[in-house]
């Protein structure tokens, strides 16, 4: 039975390797070095078929065969041994190697292009030249060209007075600062009229071409080439007239002298005519009438002449144009001045690169090079013009400010300044975004960057979405800060209804709260903006927590300063403008922060004292002031007379209305409060308004001196007693005299 099963598997396995079933993939792979089993012959197949029939005919053998087949089917296949394939090592190239490779690639392509051009010129067949056909085609072509140029020149000459009136009216209106938009509108209007005249000329040219082609498709094709070149070149010349405006100086958007404007307009027009009519008209006609390779050679000669001439014009006028650009930058806004100065340094290299790239493009792709370069140039000029106009609008708006009503300015002193600051920042940001978009559009115009594809893909959409969300975050943060700060400033200011100013304590607390609010809003805004950009702020928060813990251990004095300062403020210990004594220092509080207090002495010295170093302090502006005046009188004087003189001085002082308004209540006479060997002391005390005790004391001293002199009350003087030595002869006593000071 087993040999029958073996033969059966051989018969079933042999065709299985030779037949491929569509849609079914095999998972078992065999080594390529294993040789396939030999194909059984016909006799072996017949014997196997007969044996299989005998097996199936017997119930016992058939059952045994079925069991063996199920056993084989249930046996899992052996897992294939994985092959270890070493990874492919890719050697990274340096920047120098990449530049060398790119240079070699384009150098070989350029060399092959010149070689192919040489082989085509020397080995290609030439078409026979038919003078009669050429003369006929040239006649019809020249007639169309003369009529089209003549018609276009005539209608532009008729429109010249209109241009001049538009320019004069716009310049007159532009003298008024509020009518600055009229001049740009007239410049754009003149450009649109120029394009309409060009469209009219093309329509007339097409009508003339239909009647001047002599029924020849070749002549019609050549005339269509001329009309296409005429449309493209004259459109470029219209752009040149928009920039230089050689015939109507009033419509010239830039400060350029008439001679320079005519010089550059004329030469750039000649250059564009050489390129356009040479590549679009002359080269195709030569290729059609003579030979394609001769047309390619003509293309190379035309572009080489154009490139050499353009480079000559660029470097011949380099210094003059650079100086004009620098002078123009001096009279421009600061934002535009930066770009103009940068452009003045590199304009000749950019212009040279432009014509060199055009030359090489014409070699590699003669049919589309001029179309691409002209299209990219026009788009670039349009992008730069629109970007300059939009940026100029933003710059003019920057010069303007928002002016609030006097009532609003009185209630919210900093609101106008803050609104103008936000508006200025928003306009500057919009101006920078305008420049960035203009740069990307310029790169897209030259095929270096696909701006619209980038904008539609994930990266561009994500960038725009992030910018919009950041703008909204900054907008709401600015609005929130402006509202809260304005409310605080409104509380700090008085209104037209005579609302009194808040106390010094309230002003100090509100100022500290405003500063803390600014820090909190700024921190939250920065964190949210970083999160929107894509920065994971979780490590920043964790790092800030760890850093804060580390700082807390190393900056206990700072924490003590803050806590002590907060409690002193809540207890209304001192405020800005108070006269205080802190330790050995006495002065006026000029500044209070969350960490320290600034005190200025009467000598002008300014001291910064940390809150934590203050253990006790005295405030002279709390409730009342006090004057305790002690006056020493010679003990030989009559006490009643001296006391009466002091009362007379106080009575005269109280009659002074200015001084009387500073005194609270009545003076207190204490009489004699001290007695010494040479004097006795009289005392009088006053209760005054805060910080007015020195004014009262100075006035009192003046009155006391006056009344003591009138009453003959003497101040105490120091006396000496001379005693003779023991055994000495006593001297004659001196006559008594007045004591001397």
Curated annotation (Swiss-Prot):
Domain of life where this protein originates: Bacteria
Cellular compartments annotated: Cell inner membrane
Bias kind Low complexity: ranges: 25-34
A GO term from the CC aspect: plasma membrane
Pfam family, one: MS_channel_2nd
Quaternary structure and partners: Homoheptamer.
Known function: Mechanosensitive channel that protects cells against hypoosmotic stress when highly overexpressed.
Descriptive protein name: Moderate conductance mechanosensitive channel YbiO
Species name: Escherichia coli (strain K12)
């Amino acid at each position: 039975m087993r040999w029958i099963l073996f033969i059966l598997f051989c018969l079933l396995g042999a065709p299985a390797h030779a037949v491929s079933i569509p849609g079914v993939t095999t998972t078992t792979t065999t080594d390529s070095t294993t040789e396939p089993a030999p194909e059984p012959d016909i006799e072996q197949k017949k014997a196997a078929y007969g044996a299989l029939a005998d097996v199936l005919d017997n119930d016992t053998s058939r059952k045994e065969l079925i069991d063996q087949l199920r056993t084989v089917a249930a046996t899992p296949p052996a897992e294939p041994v994985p092959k270890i394939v070493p990874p492919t090592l890719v050697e990274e190239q340096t920047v120098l190697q990449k530049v060398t490779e790119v240079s070699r690639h384009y150098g070989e392509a350029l060399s092959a292009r010149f070689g192919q051009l040489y082989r085509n010129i020397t080995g290609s067949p030439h078409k026979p030249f038919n003078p009669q056909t050429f003369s006929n085609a040239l006649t019809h072509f020249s007639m169309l060209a003369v009529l089209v140029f003549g018609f276009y020149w005539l209608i532009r000459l008729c429109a010249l007075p209109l241009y001049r009136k538009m320019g004069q009216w716009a310049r007159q209106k532009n003298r008024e600062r509020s009518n600055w938009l009229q001049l740009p509108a007239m410049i754009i209007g003149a450009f649109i009229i120029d394009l309409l005249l060009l469209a009219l000329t093309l329509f007339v040219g097409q009508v003339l071409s239909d009647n001047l082609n002599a029924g020849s498709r070749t002549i019609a094709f050549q005339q269509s080439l001329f009309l296409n070149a005429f449309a493209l070149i004259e459109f470029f010349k219209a752009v040149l007239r928009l920039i230089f405006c050689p015939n109507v100086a009033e419509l010239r958007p830039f400060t350029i002298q008439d001679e320079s404007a005519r010089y550059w307009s004329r030469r750039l027009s000649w250059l564009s005519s050489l390129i356009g009519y040479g590549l679009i008209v002359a080269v195709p006609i030569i290729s059609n009438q003579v030979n394609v390779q001769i047309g390619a050679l003509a293309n190379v000669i035309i572009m080489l002449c154009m490139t050499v001439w353009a480079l000559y014009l660029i470097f011949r006028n380099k210094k003059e144009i650079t100086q004009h650009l620098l002078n123009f930058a001096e009279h421009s806004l600061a934002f535009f001045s930066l770009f103009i100065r940068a452009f003045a340094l590199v304009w000749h290299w950019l212009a040279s690169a432009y014509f060199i790239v055009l030359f090489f493009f014409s070699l590699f792709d003669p049919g589309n090079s001029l179309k691409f370069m002209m299209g990219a140039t026009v788009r670039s000029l349009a992008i730069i013009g629109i970007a300059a106009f939009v940026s100029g609008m933003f710059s003019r708006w920057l010069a303007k400010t928002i002016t609030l009503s006097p009532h609003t300015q009185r209630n919210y002193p900093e609101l106008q300044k803050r609104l103008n600051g936000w508006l200025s920042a928003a306009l500057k940001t919009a101006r920078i975004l305008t420049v960035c978009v203009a740069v990307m559009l310029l790169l897209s115009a030259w095929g270096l960057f696909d701006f619209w594809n980038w904008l539609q893909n994930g990266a561009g959409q994500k960038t725009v979405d992030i910018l919009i969300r950041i703008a909204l975050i900054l907008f709401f943060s600015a609005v929130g800060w402006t509202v809260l700060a304005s409310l605080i400033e409104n509380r700090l200011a008085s209104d037209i209804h005579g609302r009194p100013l808040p106390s010094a304590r309230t002003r100090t607390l509100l100022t500290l709260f405003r500063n803390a609010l600014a820090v909190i809003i700024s921190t939250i805004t920065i964190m949210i903006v970083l999160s929107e950009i894509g920065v994971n702020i979780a490590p920043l928060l964790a790092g800030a927590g760890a850093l804060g813990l580390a700082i807390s251990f190393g900056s206990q004095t700072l924490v003590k300063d803050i806590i002590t300062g907060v409690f002193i403020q809540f207890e209304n210990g001192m405020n800005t403008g108070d006269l205080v004594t802190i330790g050995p220092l006495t002065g006026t509080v000029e500044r209070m922060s969350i960490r320290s207090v600034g005190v200025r002495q009467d000598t002008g010295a300014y001291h910064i004292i940390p809150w934590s170093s203050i253990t006790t302090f005295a405030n002279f502006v709390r409730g009342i002031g006090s004057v305790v005046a002690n006056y020493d009188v010679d003990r030989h004087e009559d006490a009643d007379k001296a006391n009466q003189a002091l009362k007379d001085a106080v009575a005269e002082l109280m009659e002074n209305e200015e001084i009387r308004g500073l005194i609270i209540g009545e003076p207190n006479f204490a009489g004699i409060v001290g007695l010494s060997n040479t004097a006795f002391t009289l005392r009088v005390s006053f209760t005054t308004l805060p910080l007015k005790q020195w004014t009262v004391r100075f006035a009192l001293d003046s009155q006391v001196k006056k009344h003591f002199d009138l009453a003959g009350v003497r101040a105490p003087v120091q006396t000496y007693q001379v005693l003779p030595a023991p055994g000495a002869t006593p001297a004659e006593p001196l006559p008594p005299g007045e004591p001397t000071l």
